[in-house]
C-alpha cells in the first residue's frame, strides 16, 4: 500500500445512535481522545512502508479549527522522526470551500504542506461534479506557488450506491453556467429480456427504456440478457422466484459501468473547464464577473498569510454559493451550526454524512447486497 489513512473517529458519531453503539463515543471530546489513541498507536507501530494521511474532522468551523490545532502535530517533522505524510479531509473540511481554503493557507504557513513531506491531500465523500474542477484549480495553484508535488485525490460511493439502488449512469450533463451532473436513472429490470441477445445499449434505446445512453467499455460488451438474467418462473439461488430479473452479477456489471462513467465524467468536466466552460457555482456574476480559479490564484500567489486570509474573507459571499456534498456551507457552519451544537443535542444517522449527489440513494442497500452474497 502506498498511502492510507489513520483510524480517526469522526466527530459526528456521537450524534448518531448507531455511531454511539458502534464506537462507545458520546461526545466530540471523546472522539478527539479516541483519535489521539489511534494516532499514537499508528505512530508507534509504523514501519514506513505506507504513507499515512492525518484525517481532519469537525462538523463546523469551530470544531474543525480545534481538531486541526490538536492533531497537526502528527505531521510535524519537528515533533516526530517519522511524521504522517499528508492530509485527509473529513467532516466539514471535505465540503466547505471557505474552510478548505483557510486550512490550506494555515497548513502552508505552519510548514505542514512541504514538498517531499506532505505531498498528498485526500477528500472523503466528494460526489459533486463541479468539485472535480474546483479541486483541480486548488491543486494547480498550490503546485505553482508552494509545493510542485502536491496532489489532491477524492473518493465517492455514488457508482456503487447507484447500482445498489437499482440506478445506472446514462449521461453526463456539462453546460456553461449551469449545474453539472452525471445523470442516474432506474436501470432496466424486466424478465422478458432473459433471452434477448441484443446489445445492452441498443436494447434500452430501441425500447425507449432510456431517452439517451452513453456507452462504457463494459456496456458495449454485454447483451441485455446479461443484466436481466431471470426469466418468468426461474428460481434464484435460494430456490425462490423473486420479483427482480437481476442476480448478484447484474449488480456487479452495472457497478463497473457506473465506475467508468463516473471517472469519465470527472475527466470530461476538467477538459471542458480548461476550454472555458464553467459551472454556475464557480463564477460570480452578480456585479463584476469573478471566477473561482482567479480567486484561488490570488490566495496562493501571496506569501503573506494575513493577506491570503483577507482575500478568503473578502469573497465569503462567493463561497456560500459553492455547495459541497453535505450542503452545509458559509455562515451557517461558522455561526449557527456551532451555536446549535452548543445548545442542543441532535440525533442523526451516519448515512446523512455520506450524502451523494443523487439525494435518493440509500447507502444501506450496499450492506444488503453484501449480506446476500
Please describe what each predicted stretch is.
Residues 1-61:
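Active-site beta->alpha loop and helix N-cap motifs at the rims of alpha/beta catalytic domains
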Residues 1-6, 39-49, 76-82, 353-373:
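Intrinsic structural disorder
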Residues 13-19, 189-373:
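C-terminal extensions of enzymes
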Residues 24, 79, 111, 116, ...:
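Short, flexible coil/linker elements and helix-boundary hinge sites characteristic
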Residues 26, 38-39, 45-49, 54, ...:
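Detector for Asparagine
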Residues 28-31, 35, 64-71, 100, ...:
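Generic structural signal of hydrophobic/aromatic residues within well-ordered alpha-helices
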Residues 47-217:
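Glycine-rich phosphate/ribose-binding loops and adjacent secondary-structure elements
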Amino acid at each position: 500500500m502506498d498511502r492510507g489513512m489513520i483510524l480517526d473517529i469522526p466527530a459526528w458519531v456521537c450524534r448518531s445512535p448507531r455511531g454511539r453503539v458502534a464506537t462507545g463515543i458520546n461526545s466530540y471530546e471523546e472522539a478527539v481522545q479516541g483519535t489521539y489513541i489511534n494516532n499514537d498507536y499508528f505512530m508507534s507501530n509504523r514501519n514506513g512502508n505506507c504513507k499515512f494521511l492525518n484525517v481532519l474532522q469537525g462538523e463546523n468551523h469551530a470544531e474543525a479549527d480545534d481538531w486541526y490545532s490538536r492533531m497537526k502535530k502528527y505531521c510535524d517533522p519537528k515533533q516526530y522522526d517519522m511524521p504522517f505524510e499528508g492530509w485527509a479531509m473529513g467532516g466539514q473540511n471535505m465540503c466547505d470551500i471557505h474552510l478548505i481554503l483557510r486550512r490550506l493557507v494555515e497548513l502552508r504557513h505552519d510548514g505542514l504542506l512541504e514538498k517531499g513531506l506532505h505531498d498528498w491531500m485526500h477528500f472523503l465523500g466528494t460526489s459533486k461534479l463541479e468539485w472535480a474542477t474546483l479541486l483541480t484549480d486548488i491543486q494547480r495553484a498550490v503546485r505553482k506557488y508552494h509545493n510542485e508535488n502536491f496532489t489532491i485525490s477524492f473518493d465517492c460511493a455514488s457508482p456503487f450506491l447507484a447500482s445498489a439502488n437499482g440506478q445506472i449512469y446514462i449521461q453526463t450533463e456539462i453546460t456553461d453556467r449551469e449545474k453539472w451532473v452525471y445523470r442516474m436513472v432506474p436501470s432496466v429490470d424486466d424478465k422478458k429480456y432473459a433471452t434477448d441477445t441484443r446489445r445492452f445499449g441498443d436494447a434500452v434505446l430501441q425500447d425507449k427504456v432510456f431517452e439517451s445512453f452513453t456507452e462504457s467499455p463494459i456496456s458495449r460488451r454485454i447483451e441485455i440478457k446479461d443484466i436481466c438474467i431471470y426469466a418468468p418462473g426461474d428460481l434464484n439461488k435460494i430456490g425462490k422466484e423473486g420479483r427482480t430479473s437481476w442476480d448478484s452479477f447484474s449488480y456487479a456489471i452495472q457497478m463497473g459501468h457506473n465506475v467508468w462513467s463516473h471517472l469519465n465524467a470527472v475527466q470530461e468536466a476538467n477538459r471542458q473547464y480548461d476550454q472555458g466552460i464553467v459551472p454556475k457555482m464557480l463564477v460570480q456574476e452578480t456585479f463584476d464577473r469573478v471566477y473561482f480559479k482567479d480567486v484561488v490564484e490570488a490566495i496562493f500567489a501571496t506569501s503573506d498569510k494575513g493577506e491570503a486570509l483577507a482575500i478568503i474573507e473578502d469573497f465569503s459571499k462567493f463561497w456560500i454559493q459553492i455547495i459541497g456534498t453535505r450542503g452545509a456551507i458559509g455562515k451557517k457552519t461558522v455561526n449557527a451550526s456551532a451555536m446549535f451544537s452548543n445548545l442542543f443535542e441532535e440525533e442523526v444517522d451516519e448515512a446523512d454524512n455520506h450524502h451523494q449527489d443523487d439525494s435518493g440513494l440509500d447507502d444501506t442497500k450496499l450492506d444488503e447486497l453484501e449480506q446476500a452474497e
